[in-house]
């Protein structure tokens, strides 16, 4: 990760070997002022930014602390301390001693952490977690919120509940949803709550983190040891992985009366927005027993049919990839098993009016690399990247057409459509290089280039072009198009300006046909996240103008230590209103807007 703040004379990488320290210090720098500007009421009870040798012994104390003066609402699902029999108490003590004496002291502490697994890097400044916040009402507003905006802006993100005891990647944190209710031109309420996953409930009952962190911990021999330790605890009945191991921290989608919080390592979780603006986790959601596998965090809701299209990938056993969809009433299609030679990281995909577009890129899973001391997430340079084009209602994968797109890795795809004039499928995504830099340390500068990719399924040929001219090239990541036009040709995309990486200094409106770029910049020392486009008429299949709507986004002021919600006119990119939030909102991942009608139609 590159320069997050002006250089300082204090290195946070003192514990790393000299070579790693030099690399990390050149690529990640933090300002003490930015960290100390966090309001003291929200600071963690234990220091978070420690060398691995100084990381705490297994913590009995959650990292996320409620804000004084605002008592946290009771958690119905918490269930208290886990009751253990004599054998389990002995096994727990022995396994804890093995973790501290061998895994931590022998396998981990003699080695430095890469920046991609260093808590001092991954959860510093406004990436650090916050405590839960019960609803706060009647928030101050500057400017005018358009009265048509009626609903809840909800945004997901990673917010570790416990202090890390080993490596930690930003993607490893527990899911927390931040929700802002807007109605009649007023900001009625704000709340943030953990999504009460089975993983989080079990760790709270035990009083410490025990589930493996997929990116931060599972590398090398120590990763194998931590996996073995986890399954030993499961064999002793100390944890139950069958109840779910995911963190539900990435995506949000509203479908069939339910707001679903998702990460690709588990089933979705149903989160309900209460009448007072609070958030309640209903539970792990398997679509009434129809879904028995994990689902990626970016399912696609077709605005015309109401169908929800999804993928599921498996890193251990075949089939490594499956496609399925849900009809508007929630009934599930049969799985289409897509044959892949090796398990592949597929974080996102795209739909058109009639097709599903599936990336098969070079970032793959090779668990055997852990035996060699490496990460199981690997850039396979011998593999040729490709996209698969499959009819939405295909009976099996025999209808899939593959098109090679060499050296292309799109972590996110913003839209796709069918070009009737050429017969090609047009895909809009951000091509990232180095492809594995999010997961593995790299000396190269990360670039995320907004790209138009054209796939000709008849000939197997592809072309690609950068949407922006070289003189205007900026890193564009996380964002969306008008959701009423998803899968159809769109002119505009609203994307975060991810500079200086990994912070977001503003967002851009991009004309996908001309490359014209219009930026909305947050200002010095102010950073945000994903822009959420809210169309003027949420149900309009053909709006008056594609950009007829507003953009909502959270922004944090590092100097003042305050956070806000901005409301920006999507057509002219002018600020309409600012909502002052009662507490800090960390940088997060993806969000959605739930309309007032959808709130009223929520399932119990």
From Swiss-Prot:
EC number(s) given by UniProt? 1.13.11.51
Question: Per the annotation, how and in what number is the cofactor bound?
Answer: Binds 1 Fe(2+) ion per subunit.
Q: Where is the composition biased (Basic residues)?
A: 12-22
- Provide GO CC annotations from the record: chloroplast stroma
For this protein, the parts annotated as crossing the membrane are none
Report the transit peptide positions: 1-23
Chain residues that bind Fe cation: 298, 347, 412, 590
Q: Where in the cell is it found?
A: Plastid, Chloroplast stroma
Cofactors required: Fe(2+)
Catalysed reaction(s) here are:
a 9-cis-epoxycarotenoid + O2 = a 12'-apo-carotenal + 2-cis,4-trans-xanthoxin; 9-cis-violaxanthin + O2 = (3S,5R,6S)-5,6-epoxy-3-hydroxy-5,6-dihydro-12'-apo-beta-caroten-12'-al + 2-cis,4-trans-xanthoxin; 9'-cis-neoxanthin + O2 = (3S,5R,6R)-3,5-dihydroxy-6,7-didehydro-5,6-dihydro-12'-apo-beta-caroten-12'-al + 2-cis,4-trans-xanthoxin
Q: According to its UniProt entry, what is the function of this protein?
A: Has a 11,12(11',12') 9-cis epoxycarotenoid cleavage activity. Catalyzes the first step of abscisic-acid biosynthesis from carotenoids. Not active on the all-trans isomers of violaxanthin and neoxanthin. Contributes probably to abscisic acid synthesis for the induction of seed dormancy.
> What protein family is recorded?
Belongs to the carotenoid oxygenase family.
Stated name of the protein: 9-cis-epoxycarotenoid dioxygenase 1, chloroplastic
Q: Supply the source organism for this entry.
A: Zea mays (Maize)
**Gene for this chain:** VP14
């Amino acid at each position: 990760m590159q320069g997050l703040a002006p250089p300082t004379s204090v290195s946070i990488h003192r514990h790393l070997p000299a070579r790693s320290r030099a690399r990390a210090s050149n690529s990640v720098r933090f300002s003490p002022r930015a960290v100390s500007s966090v309001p003291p009421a929200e600071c963690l009870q234990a220091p978070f930014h420690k060398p691995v040798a100084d990381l705490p012994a297994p913590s009995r104390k959650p990292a996320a602390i409620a804000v004084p003066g605002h008592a946290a609402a009771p958690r119905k699902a918490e269930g208290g301390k886990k009751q253990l029999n004599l054998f389990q108490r002995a096994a727990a003590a022995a396994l804890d001693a093995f973790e501290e004496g061998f895994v931590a002291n022998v396998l981990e502490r003699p080695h430095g952490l890469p920046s991609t697994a260093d808590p001092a890097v991954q959860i510093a400044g406004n990436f650090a977690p916050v405590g839960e916040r019960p609803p706060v009402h009647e928030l101050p507003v500057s400017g005018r919120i358009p009265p048509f905006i009626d609903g809840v802006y909800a945004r997901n993100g990673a917010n570790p509940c416990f202090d890390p005891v080993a490596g930690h990647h930003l993607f490893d944190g527990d899911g927390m949803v931040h929700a802002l209710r807007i109605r009649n031109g007023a900001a009625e309420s704000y709340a943030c709550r953990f999504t009460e996953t089975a993983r989080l409930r079990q760790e709270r009952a035990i009083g410490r983190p025990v589930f493996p962190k997929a990116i931060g911990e599972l590398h090398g021999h120590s990763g194998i040891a931590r996996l073995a330790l986890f399954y030993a605890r499961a064999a002793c009945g100390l944890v139950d992985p069958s109840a779910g191991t995911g963190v539900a921290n990435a995506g949000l989608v509203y479908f069939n009366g339910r707001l679903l919080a998702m990460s690709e390592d588990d089933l979705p979780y149903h989160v309900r927005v209460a009448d007072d603006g609070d958030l309640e986790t209903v539970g792990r959601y398997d679509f009434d027993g129809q879904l028995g596998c994990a689902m990626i965090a970016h399912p696609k809701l077709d605005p015309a049919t109401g169908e929800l299209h999804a993928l599921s990938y498996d890193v251990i056993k075949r089939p490594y990839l499956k496609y399925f969809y849900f009809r508007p009433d929630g009934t599930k299609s049969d799985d289409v098993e897509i044959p892949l030679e090796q398990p592949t990281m597929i974080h996102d995909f795209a739909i058109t009016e009639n097709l599903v577009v599936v990336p098969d890129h070079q970032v793959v899973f090779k668990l055997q690399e852990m035996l060699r001391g490496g990460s199981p997430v690997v850039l396979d340079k011998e593999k040729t990247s490709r996209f698969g084009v499959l009819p939405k209602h295909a009976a099996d994968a025999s209808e899939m057409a593959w098109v090679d797109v060499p050296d292309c890795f799109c972590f996110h795809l913003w839209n796709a459509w069918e070009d009737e004039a050429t017969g090609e499928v047009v895909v809009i995504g951000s091509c990232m290089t180095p492809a594995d830099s999010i997961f593995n340390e790299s000396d190269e500068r990360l670039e995320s280039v907004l790209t138009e990719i054209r796939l000709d399924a008849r000939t197997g040929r592809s072309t690609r072009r950068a949407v922006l001219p070289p003189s205007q090239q900026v890193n564009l990541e996380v964002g969306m198009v008008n959701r009423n036009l998803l899968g159809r040709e769109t002119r505009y995309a609203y994307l975060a300006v991810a500079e200086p990486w990994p912070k977001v200094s503003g967002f851009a409106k991009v004309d996908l046909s001309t490359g014209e770029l219009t930026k909305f910049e947050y200002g010095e020392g102010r950073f945000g996240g994903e822009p959420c486009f809210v169309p003027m008429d949420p149900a309009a299949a053909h709006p008056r103008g594609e950009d007829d709507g507003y953009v909502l986004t959270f922004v944090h002021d590092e100097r003042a230590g305050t956070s806000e919600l901005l409301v920006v006119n999507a057509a002219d990119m002018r600020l309409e209103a600012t909502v002052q939030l009662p507490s800090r909102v960390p940088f997060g991942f993806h969000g959605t807007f739930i309309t007032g009608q959808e709130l009223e139609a929520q399932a119990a």
